[in-house]
């Protein structure tokens, strides 16, 4: 997604911390899984050092200790973290506790999937990618704390399933429906242009099957904002159900 291993480490750490924040928990420790492309020993060591330095910057800011992990050489650069956290059992935020009358709040603009697909094709503007990268580098920690203070009952993070997929994960167990104003969705700069040009990530077509769950989907499908609701996200935002008087 990004060529800079230091930034890649930061983005990956944010992405992995989101699962903890989405449950209302406080991260404690992390284990790394790293694969660095084959190369000269000095190059491999430098890439690994930059990856972990970026990740450690994010983890340290989250008061999370990197306690170990596993590294290897492989065909391509990969990085992931298993993050452990703590929470009071009575305060867990799950996906199945939406309540009628609540408002859904999303903490980040969407569009990383289509924007970086466009960047790979040489069809994205530099300031679009810079804006998207800054979004991915932004932690959801403060937003998660805000949700807890204002009575959120249900929460999820937006990743590969896109907004529609993750919202459906919240709606179906709760047996609730949602009135969604697409004009209120925050969008990353350039996302409507790239999705409107038909540039999508590899996961987008899989996500489109959930369109049948949306009323009047066929009539609105040509709107690029509708297409962006199926766009998979990396280090995306949180979506939480909050009482209307707290929203």
For the regions a protein language model found, what residue spans apply to each?
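Helix-biased detector of long, well-ordered alpha-helical tracts
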Residues: 1-247
């Amino acid at each position: 997604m990004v060529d800079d291993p230091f930034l890649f480490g930061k983005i990956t750490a944010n992405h992995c911390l989101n699962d903890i924040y989405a449950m209302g928990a406080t991260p404690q420790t992390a284990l790394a899984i790293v694969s660095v492309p084959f190369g000269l020993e000095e190059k491999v060591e430098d890439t690994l050092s930059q990856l972990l330095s970026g990740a450690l910057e994010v983890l340290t800011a989250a008061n999370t200790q990197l306690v170990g992990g596993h590294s290897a050489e492989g065909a391509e650069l990969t990085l992931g973290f298993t993050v452990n956290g703590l929470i009071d059992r009575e305060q867990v935020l799950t996906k199945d506790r939406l309540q009628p009358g609540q408002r859904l709040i999303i903490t980040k603009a969407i569009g990383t999937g289509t924007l970086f697909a466009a960047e790979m094709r040489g069809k994205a503007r530099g300031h679009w990618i810079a804006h998207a990268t800054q979004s991915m580098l932004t932690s959801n920690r403060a937003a998660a704390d805000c949700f807890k203070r204002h009575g959120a009952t249900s929460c999820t993070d937006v990743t590969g399933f896109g907004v529609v997929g993750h919202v459906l994960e919240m709606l179906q167990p709760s047996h609730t429906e949602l009135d969604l104003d697409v004009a209120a969705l925050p969008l990353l700069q350039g996302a409507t242009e790239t999705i409107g040009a038909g540039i999508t990530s590899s996961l987008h077509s899989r996500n489109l099957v959930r369109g049948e769950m949306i009323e009047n989907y066929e009539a609105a499908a040509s709107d690029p904002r509708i297409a962006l609701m199926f766009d998979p996200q990396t280090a995306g935002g949180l979506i939480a159900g909050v009482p209307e008087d707290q929203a």
